[in-house]
Amino acid sequence: MILIYGPAGSGKSTQGRLLAEKLGRTWLSAGQLIRDSHRFDEYTSKGAMIPENILVDLLWENMKAVFDRDGEVVFDGQPGSVEQVGMLEKCGVFKHTEFVVLLKVPEEELLKRLATRGREDDNIEVWKQKITYFEQKSYSFLIEMKRRGVKICEVDGVGSVEEVNERIMKLIQKN
């Protein structure tokens, strides 16, 4: 599994989908699973964080189906916290993890992208909450992943979809 990680607006789903297509893997997106399920609309419409145990259940039920089939996954979004890492590790997720691609995008660029994407839960307060949440959780998440032996590879997420994807593909070829 290759995990694509970054804040809201960094291009996780765009790059995850494209990468899965190029590598012939299954694409799973935490954000898309959440939006498609509609079980979490009360949280997402306000920018509130979904309780971690509920979120992990949703992620695991979808990941397990892919791992049981072939295990070749590009996953974007979560886990977003140390607590989620621990819960997912109990499910055996990280024995499948090759490395994490961390998309680095400045906040001004994130806000510019978010303003043009057109999702119904998009508004500036929700975006700022999501960016703040990522900033608060990402450092400890990345430290925990490194502690567990998972390689973290930073990629400049600024540029066209094709430019960013080319950077990621070069990184994959090196690893």
Task: Say what each PLM segment does.
Residues 1-175:
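Glycine-rich phosphate-binding loop of ATP-dependent small-molecule kinases
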